[in-house]
Amino acid sequence: MSGRLVLVLGDQLDRASAAFDGFDRGRDRVWMAEVAGESTHVWSHKARIAVFLSGMRHFRTALRHERIDVDYTALAATPAPGEPPSLAEALAASLAEAKRRGIEPDALVVVEPGEWRVRQALSAAAEQARVPLEIRPDRHFFSSVEDFATHAAGRKQLRLEYFYRSLRERHGVLLDDGEPAGGQWNYDVENRGAFPKTGPGRLPAPVRFEPDAITREVIDLVNVRFAGHPGSLDAFDWPVTPADARAALDDFLVHRLADFGRYQDAIWTGAPWLYHARLAQALNMKLLDPRDVVAGAERLYRAGKVPLEAAEGFIRQVIGWREYVRGVYWHFMPEYEHRNALTADRPLPSFYWTADTEMNCLRDALSQTLRHGYAHHIQRLMVTGLFALLSGVRPQDVHRWYLAVYVDAVEWVELPNTLGMSQFADGGVMASKPYCASGAYLDRMSNACRGCRFNPKVAVGADACPFTTLYWDFLARHEKLLKTNPRMGMQLKNLARKDAAELRQIRRQADGLRDAAG
C-alpha cells in the first residue's frame, strides 16, 4: 500500500486546495492526466485546449520543484497506441498499473470537480477499482454547495440579490458598521453607460503573457493534434501560472477597474477587452483566489482610487454571480442540463463557428471569439446569446457552443449562465425575465449598427435588422407564457400596438431568417 493518490484536475490548479491537506510527501502522490476526450466532448477552441494543458504542465512542474511525486500523463501530437480517451479510463489504467506493481493507493482524494459528468466518471472509476474516493469541499469559493442548498430551502423563487447580500454580510465585504457601503447594496443602475459617439478613446491594453517554453510546446501540440478545431492560437497570451494571474489582477485593478462599472454593459466593435477584467479564466482554473480579487477591489475603493459603483459592480460579479451560478448548477443538476422552457428546437446557426454573417455586432463578437477564445459578458448575453434566444435555438446546442469556445468555460459556471441567464431555458430560476431585446438595444449600447447594412429600427423588408424582426416574433410566439411575468408588461404592451397584418409579415420574415441561418 502506498498512501493516497491525490487527483488534480485541469480546473483545480490551486496549491492551497483542500486536496493537499495532510499530504505526506513520503507516501502520497499526485495524479494528473491530459486526455483528448476533455477537448473533444465539445468541439473545443484551440485556445481553450492550450490554456488548460499549459496550466496543468506548469502546475506539475511547480509540484515537482517541491519534490512532490506527480504521476502525469501527457498528450502527444500523435495519439499513442492504447491512449485512454477519457479521464475515467486514464484513471482506471493508472490504478490497474499501480495494482500490478504493488503500489495501489489506500485511497483517492479529489476536490469537488467542476462538472457533474466528471464527478460521476471519477466515482465510477474508483468504485470499479475498489479504491475509496474522498471528495473534499472546494474552499476556493466563498460559499459551499450546502450553503446554497440551505439558502434555497423553502424559497419559491431564487434570486441573486439575496444570496449576494448574505455573502457580503458573512464575509464583511463593502460594509460600514454592518451596513452596505454608501447605503445601497447594488449600484447596477449607475453601471449601464454607453460610450459617446466618438468611442471609448484610448483604452489601456491588458498585460500580455508571452508564451514560455512550456506554453510554446503546448501550442505546437494543439496546432497538430487538434488542427481541425475552431479558433486560432496566433494571439494566445493567457495567464497560465499563479504569478501570471496575480499580475493580470494587479493590471486590471490599477488600469481598468475605475471605468469598469460605468461601461460594463457597453460594446465597441474592434475593442474586445474595453475595461473588462479578463480574470474569469484564471479564477476558474483556480490560479487566482477570489478573496484576493475582492479584497483588491475594495482596497482601491477605500483608498479613494475607484468609485464605489465600479468596486461594487465588479465585486458583485465575483462574490455574487460567480457563487450564485455555482449554487444553481449543483442544486439542480443533473436534470438542469435538459431544461427547455421555451421548447426551442432550431439548430445553432453554422456562422457561429465561422463569423460569416452580415450582422456587424455578431460578426465582431464571433470573430474575436474565434481569435481569442473570449468575448465579454454583455457580448455573450446580448449579442450571441440574444440572437440564439430570439432564433429559437436548442438551448443544449447553445450550451455546448459556449462550453467549447471560451477559455474560461467550465460547466458549473457556463451552463447556468447559458441555459438560465441567456436562453431562459430554466423558466426563470436564474433570471427573473428573458433577456430579450431588439436591434434598438444594440444601437443604443454599441457602435455596431453604424455602417451595418441592416436598420435596427425596421422589422420587415430587405433592410430590416434580424434582431428586430426576431424580437417581435419572439414576443408574439411566447406571449401566453410571457404574460404571466410582470416584468414583461411594457414589452408586451408595445407588442399589442402591432396589428395582425404586421405580425404576419414579421412571422414570415422571421421564419425566413431562421431557415436561412439553419
What do these predicted regions represent?
Residues 1-75:
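N-terminal beta-strand-loop-alpha-helix module at the start
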Residues 9, 16, 21, 266, ...:
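C-terminal catalytic domain of photolyase/cryptochrome flavoproteins
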Residues 12-14, 37, 115-116, 140-141, ...:
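Short, solvent-exposed loop/turn segments at secondary-structure junctions
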Residues 16-20, 42-44, 82-84, 118-123, ...:
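A short acidic (Asp/Glu
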Residues 33-35, 132-144, 412-420:
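A generic structural motif
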Residues 38-39, 169-282, 460-468, 479-518:
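A eukaryotic "domain-start" boundary segment
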Residues 44-98, 107, 112-114, 155:
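N-terminal Rossmann-like or analogous alpha/beta NTP/dinucleotide-binding catalytic cores
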Residues 83-238:
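Beta-rich, aromatic/charged-enriched effector core domains that present basic-aromatic interfaces
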